[in-house]
């Protein structure tokens, strides 16, 4: 428990290994790989609590998270730490210290207003911006279309769950020699988003990767039609890399399970009020 609280209050990170050789690429747009236990068993424990919250009416979610949904300022904090003075979003600037893509639903918890759902059997969709592997789209590679000689490539990932995000990180670990994943204190600890910071580009591998992508998309520039789910590797990445990734993501999901459990206990407490011991513990933890 102490380790969970420490990660929430101080953040957590991991340095991923560099691979000189790209994995065999086979880009296919339109569908994500399905989840499996191999890519994170903790998710399947954590998703049970997410489903509990997903069944709650959204007006109640808003009430109980109003004071703990602080503005997500993790990207700004990363810019400050790395002394990044200018960033390039989707080609909007010709010169910058970093090229950036934010795939997260910044400062949002749910997708649409909704009443309560009777039971998990009646759940047909994930209405929360939490643990949704379908949120990872091919936009995660969009900065590479704009990358010239920037020092950093920075991605705000919408989720850490599923094969897609692990395959994506494995590719980035051949495109750049230094790749870190960070879950900052100033990110939302209600959501499984995180930041990738990549630097020291491997030009040879980047050229090979972009050649494959451009041949599949039949375009040398980014097209919005490519903003869809995708799969990119036929073969699973090596177990060593998966375990290194899970070393980081498991810390995040353990913390989220604790936070979500407190929130659910607060929302279902006998007091029928936001003034209860679970909510007080939650506020103390996150503020």
UniProtKB/Swiss-Prot annotation:
InterPro entries: Poxvirus_mRNA-cap_ssu, Poxvirus_mRNA-cap_ssu_sf
GO cellular component terms attached to this protein's record: virion component
Keywords tagged on the record: mRNA capping, mRNA processing, Transcription, Transcription regulation, Transcription termination, Virion
Pfam families: Pox_mRNA-cap (PF03341)
Gene3D superfamilies assigned: Poxvirus mRNA capping enzyme, small subunit
Cell compartment(s), UniProt: Virion
Keyword check for Transcription: yes
Record's function text: Regulatory subunit of the mRNA cap enzyme which stabilizes the catalytic subunit and enhances its methyltransferase activity through an allosteric mechanism. Heterodimeric mRNA capping enzyme catalyzes the linkage of a N7-methyl-guanosine moiety to the first transcribed nucleotide (cap 0 structure), whereas the methyltransferase OPG102 is responsible for a second methylation at the 2'-O position of the ribose (cap 1 structure). Also involved in early viral gene transcription termination and intermediate viral gene transcription initiation.
Protein name, UniProt field: mRNA-capping enzyme regulatory subunit OPG124
Source species taxonomy: Viruses, Varidnaviria, Bamfordvirae, Nucleocytoviricota, Pokkesviricetes
């Amino acid at each position: 428990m102490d380790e969970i609280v420490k990660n929430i209050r101080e953040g957590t990170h991991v340095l991923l290994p560099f691979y000189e050789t790209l994995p065999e690429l086979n880009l296919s747009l339109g569908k994500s790989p399905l989840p499996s236990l191999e890519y994170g068993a903790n998710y399947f424990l954590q998703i049970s609590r997410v489903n509990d919250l997903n069944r709650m009416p959204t007006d109640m979610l808003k009430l109980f998270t109003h004071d703990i949904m602080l503005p997500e300022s993790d990207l700004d904090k990363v810019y400050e730490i790395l002394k990044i003075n200018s960033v390039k979003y989707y080609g909007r600037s010709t010169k910058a210290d970093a090229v950036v893509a934010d795939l997260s639903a910044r400062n949002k918890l749910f997708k649409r207003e909704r009443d309560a759902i009777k039971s998990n059997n009646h759940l047909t969709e994930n209405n929360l911006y939490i643990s949704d592997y379908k949120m990872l789209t091919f936009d995660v590679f969009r900065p590479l279309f704009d990358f010239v000689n920037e020092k950093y490539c920075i991605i705000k990932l919408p989720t850490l769950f599923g094969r897609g995000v692990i395959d994506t990180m494995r590719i980035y670990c051949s495109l750049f020699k230094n790749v870190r994943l960070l879950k900052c204190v100033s990110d939302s600890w209600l959501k499984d988003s995180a930041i990738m910071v990549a630097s020291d580009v491997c030009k040879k591998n980047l050229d090979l990767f972009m050649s494959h992508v451009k041949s599949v998309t039949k375009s040398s520039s980014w097209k919005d039609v490519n903003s869809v789910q995708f799969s990119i590797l036929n073969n699973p990445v090596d177990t060593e890399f998966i375990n290194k990734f899970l070393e980081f993501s498991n810390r995040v999901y353990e913390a989220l399970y604790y936070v979500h459990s407190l929130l659910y206990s607060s929302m279902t407490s006998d007091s029928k009020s936001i003034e209860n011991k679970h909510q007080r513990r939650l506020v103390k933890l996150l503020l």
